[in-house]
């Protein structure tokens, strides 16, 4: 597995933060690094496999990667990212309490993926632009100013995650996307789901395609297939059981779709493990 080292990304040993833009981000194999990373999705779509679990990416996704996590990007489609790198939550000279504004693992569950709305993405652009420039010097006041901008960015993201579940259409669409991610095995009737999240059906179709680059049904099928691949790799369930657990009513149809998506059959994937 590829290991990325901080010495290759930070401008100096005293630099607390580094910015790496990916415009666009191409597919990248599984890797980990000796620093922390905040991945902010500005445009496009793709799949982020984080510690073996697949997450679909779209504009407004924010991913928090620790120094012991492993991840990869695949199926990227004009995926524009800004990566904010920092050494560790407790590695700043003048900041304390950074961990309060980061995801916290609870009972083995780490909420690594957040969402923020378009307004927050606009608000943080100037902060990211400031962080792109290394501190003017190694003087304590320049390091302190640089760290303070990072804290502003972190607080903006945290506030944005707390408020994105608002009652406007964008907030309700984000709630719907999160529901689909967490309930991939349930049967979906789009008119009922539109009513559940108080979205006109045509608006749901249009906005979901704008956010993900896919029709709702294509997006749902992709979610099912990604979860099925995860089950094939990390469970002992049979191919037939996995097909039903992941929302497919017919195992043969599942195998056909799986091969079309990943260029190999479910059984071929299993045989390679």
Swiss-Prot record:
CC per GO annotation: cytoplasm
GO biological process: positive regulation of DNA-templated transcription; regulation of DNA-templated transcription; rhamnose metabolic process
Domain HTH araC/xylS-type, chain residue ranges per copy: 174-272
DNA-binding region: 191-212, 239-262
Site (Interaction with sigma-70): 241, 250
Keyword Repeat tagged: yes
Protein's cellular compartments: Cytoplasm
PROSITE patterns assigned to the protein according to its UniProt record, in alphabetical order: HTH_ARAC_FAMILY_2 (PS01124)
Pfam families named among the record's database cross-references: AraC_binding, HTH_18
GO MF terms held by the record: cis-regulatory region sequence-specific DNA binding; DNA-binding transcription factor activity
Alphabetical keyword list: Activator, Cytoplasm, DNA-binding, Repeat, Rhamnose metabolism, Transcription, Transcription regulation
HAMAP family linked: HTH_type_RhaS
Subunit and partners: Binds DNA as a dimer.
Function, in words: Activates expression of the rhaBAD and rhaT operons.
Protein name: HTH-type transcriptional activator RhaS
Organism: Yersinia pestis
